[in-house]
Amino acid sequence: KKSDILGELDLEPREYFLVTAHRPENVDNRTRLKGILKGLERVQKEFSLPVIFPVHPRTEKRIKELGIGENGLNLTKPFGFLEFLQLESQARLVLTDSGGVQEETCVLGVPCATMRYDTERPETLDVGSNILVGADSQKILEAVRSTESWKPDWKNPYGDGIAGKMIIMVCAATRPQ
C-alpha cells in the first residue's frame, strides 16, 4: 500500500520538519514542554517551513491543561504507521523524544534531533544520524541549523535490510523435500 500523505498535507519532500513528543519527562514538565514548543516555533519562523506535529493524546492533553498555545505549529491528529513512515522518510529533519523514531530515521537516512538529555539508542549518536538537544529552545534551533550540512552517509547500525530474505533462503534450503 502506498501513502499519499505528502499530497494530502500539501508537502514537498525535504521541505518540512516532523515532530513527535510524548515522553512524560517532556510533556508533564511545563518548563520542558514550553521549551520544546518555543524551539519548534523558532525553527518554523527561521526556516519558513511547515513543522508537522502529530500530537500524541497525552501531549495534546498537557498542551491544553497548561494553556500553552500552538505557537504557529501544524498540530495534527496522529497518523497511521504507513503515513507516518512516509512523513519520516521525506522530512528534512525529525525532532523526537521517541526511541523507535530515532532508529527509524537512522535506517531511512533522515537526520534526527532527540529532545531528551540521554537516549537508549546510543548507536544513532555514534554513527552520526542523531544528536541530543534536550528541551532547550536555543539548542533545538541550533540543531536544526547544524543539520543543514548533514549528509545521510552514516552506516546503518541495525543491519543491511535483507534479514527476511536470508531467513527465507535458510528455511527453503533446510526444508525437507
Predicted regions and their residues:
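Nucleotide-activated sugar donor-binding and catalytic core shared by glycosyltransferases
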Residues: 1-49, 53-55, 59-177
